[in-house]
Amino acid sequence: AELTPLDTTYEITEGNNLVSWPSHSSCSVGDAIPDEFEENICGVIGEGVAAIPNETFGWVGSLQLFQDGKGYWLCSDVDMYYNWDAANCEGTLSRKAEQSAAIPSGYEYKQSTEQAFYFIESIENIEMGDWILSYNDDVVIGARQWSGEITDVPTMGDDGSEYTKGYIKSGVAPSFKILRGDELINLEGDIPAFE
């Protein structure tokens, strides 16, 4: 398949913009986004993965590598002309994205075209290996294993398809639970509405 040329310039508007990764080589988020644009990028979302900039840790979240043939939603704070630093990654060994741990049986969910991510910095008494589950009423709409650092929890919305019936709608706040072994622990907090 033909890729977008490496020197493609995108006209980015404030908000979310769909862009493609123009290289056969995978590239880390921090290497792929040129330094001169980083302060204007508020996040990047892929299929079930996301990353946001963090002043202390750099790029955090489950999106570690941009991959050949994939599209991404790039969130910008401003209108700008943008280009990837894909040449920075050319000729390097193609790395594979880390595979996420398999979601425990009974807590699976379907990918939706309507998705949001909740970035969680800390939870009292959470342990490595625990899962953070997002819910709409009693329907599981997302899951991510706690990584010990800032963890992005995907939350799927109702996109009108049969697969997402019962998923969350815009303006409603999800609930979150910790899954530890077979035990579900409700989480309390000020949770923003799904958008």
Q: What are these language model-derived features?
A:
Residues A1-E195:
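N-terminal exported-region signature
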